[in-house]
């Protein structure tokens, strides 16, 4: 008989599906509940209720209560052996307290102290896995079964493919103000390079003028990129930029692994994780804008080889979601 897993997490870049697929299908049966932090269950009705509401805070409160009722109803009907919660920022404490017949796991894919609702779940978990290594010791005071666990990549999606490398510089991700400033400076410094930035920022119903203007922008592309599309873009790029959120201290983002999984060349801002785990590999890191600009200048002047088979082999062997799921199951 297969072990039943109920996986609950935010709908973001298909991470829930990637984690679910990492469970061995011969041994595990996985049911997924995707959610949105503003309107709970992902369906058209909830979106209408939220966006048409005159008081969105109240609407969100009601929709998240509805989500928690749905989670408990699913739990009671499905009767999982393991509840695997990713982030869990919208899951109520009382919801977890009623999950008495299962092993309950929390995995954070960003800093837990930026998610106060997630912190409230810590003492109710059988094990907690954290994005930030610096968060482990403080959280251990509440739950001794707390471990550092970085993200990973889905090796069924991110892989090397044979396509023409027609993009010089590529960035995919959320455009915070600091990132926009850096990318604009980068384009101004290297105007002859083919630079592409993908991020869904504007919707017609919210900002019609900015949306229409974005249709004519050939650099900042107003588009959500699926994981499959991201893999193609990484393979097309000569240089993939990776900039971590300012909140990241030690933790490394999933794109670090996804770009390497596509066997693409990555220029990434320096993080201690890279020193600790990849010191004997040629990871291209920078600490300042000046260093990044010089790296790009040298790359497009000398055009050194991009493929690194040894690095790709390391990533594929140790940093897939299958590796992470196996580690989690060992701990619980």
What do these predicted regions represent?
Residues 282-289, 298-302:
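Conserved acidic donor-binding segment of nucleotide-sugar-dependent glycosyltransferases
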Residues 58-80:
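An amphipathic, basic-hydrophobic alpha-helix
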Residues 72-76, 96-98, 114:
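Catalytic alpha-helical scaffold of carbohydrate-active enzymes acting on polysaccharides/glycoconjugates
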Residues 2-53, 64-70, 86-90, 95, ...:
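Nucleotide-sugar donor-binding catalytic core of glycosyltransferases
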Residues 300-332:
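A charged, aromatic-enriched C-terminal amphipathic alpha-helix characteristic of glycosyltransferases
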Residues 82-87, 97-111:
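Active-site proximal beta-strand in glycosyltransferases
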């Amino acid at each position: 008989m297969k072990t039943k897993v109920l996986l609950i997490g935010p709908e973001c870049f298909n991470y829930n599906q990637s984690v679910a697929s990492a469970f061995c299908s011969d041994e595990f049966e996985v049911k997924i509940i995707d959610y949105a932090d503003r309107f709970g269950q992902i369906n058209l009705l909830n979106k209408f209720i939220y966006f048409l509401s005159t008081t969105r805070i109240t609407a969100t409160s009601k929709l998240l209560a509805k989500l928690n009722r749905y989670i408990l109803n699913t739990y009671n009907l499905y009767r999982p052996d393991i509840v695997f919660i990713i982030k869990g920022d919208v899951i109520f404490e009382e919801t977890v307290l009623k999950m008495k017949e299962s092993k309950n796991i929390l995995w954070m894919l960003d800093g837990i102290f930026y998610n106060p609702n997630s912190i409230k779940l810590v003492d109710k978990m059988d094990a907690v896995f954290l994005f930030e290594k610096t968060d482990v010791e403080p959280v251990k005071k509440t739950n001794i079964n707390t471990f550092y666990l970085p993200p990973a990549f889905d090796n069924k999606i991110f892989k090397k493919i044979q396509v023409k490398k027609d993009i010089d510089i590529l960035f995919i991700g959320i455009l915070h103000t600091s990132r926009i400033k850096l990318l604009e400076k980068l384009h101004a410094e290297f105007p002859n390079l083919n630079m592409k930035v993908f991020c869904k920022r504007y919707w017609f119903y919210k900002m019609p003028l900015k949306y229409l203007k974005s249709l004519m922008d050939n650099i900042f592309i107003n588009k959500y990129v699926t994981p499959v599309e991201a893999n193609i873009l990484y393979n097309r790029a000569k240089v993939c930029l990776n900039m971590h959120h300012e909140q990241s201290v030690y933790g490394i983002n999933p794109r670090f692994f996804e770009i390497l999984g596509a066997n693409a060349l990555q220029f990434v801002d320096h993080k201690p994780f890279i020193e600790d785990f990849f010191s004997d590999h040629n990871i291209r890191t920078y600490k300042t804008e000046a260093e990044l600009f010089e790296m790009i200048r040298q790359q497009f002047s000398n055009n050194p080889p991009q493929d690194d088979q040894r690095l790709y082999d390391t990533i594929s062997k140790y940093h897939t979601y299958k590796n992470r799921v196996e580690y989690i199951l060992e701990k619980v």
